[in-house]
């Protein structure tokens, strides 16, 4: 419940632009947000391993 309200609060336009921050739309996590994909690192890993992110492959060398 608290995390849901924080997601809603983060989506509103802040009084000052410096207060704006990104949250994962799936889990609501505020840290480790990957801007290119618009999700956090944990959701990124799970979606990439399921093959839901096109063009993302596990690196190997």
Curated annotation (Swiss-Prot):
Protein name (Swiss-Prot/TrEMBL): Small ribosomal subunit protein uS14
Transport is among the record's keywords: no
Pfam families: Ribosomal_S14
Requisite cofactors: Zn(2+)
NCBIfam families membership: PRK08061.1 (NF005974)
Chain positions recorded as Zn(2+) binding sites: 24, 27, 40, 43
InterPro entries: Ribosomal_uS14 (IPR001209), Ribosomal_uS14_bact (IPR023053), Ribosomal_uS14_CS (IPR018271), Ribosomal_uS14_sf (IPR043140)
Gene: rpsZ
Note on cofactor: Binds 1 zinc ion per subunit.
Subunit and interaction comment: Part of the 30S ribosomal subunit. Contacts proteins S3 and S10.
Protein's UniProt keywords contain Oxidoreductase: no
Family recorded in the similarity comment: Belongs to the universal ribosomal protein uS14 family. Zinc-binding uS14 subfamily.
Key words of the record: Metal-binding, Ribonucleoprotein, Ribosomal protein, RNA-binding, rRNA-binding, Zinc
Function, as annotated: Binds 16S rRNA, required for the assembly of 30S particles and may also be responsible for determining the conformation of the 16S rRNA at the A site.
MF term (GO), any: structural constituent of ribosome
């Amino acid at each position: 419940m608290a995390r849901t309200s924080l997601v809603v609060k983060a989506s509103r336009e802040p009084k000052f632009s410096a207060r704006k921050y990104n949250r994962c739309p799936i889990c609501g996590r505020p840290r480790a947000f990957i801007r290119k994909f618009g999700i956090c690192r944990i959701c990124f890993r799970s979606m990439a391993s399921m093959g839901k992110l096109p063009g993302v492959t596990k690196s190997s060398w």
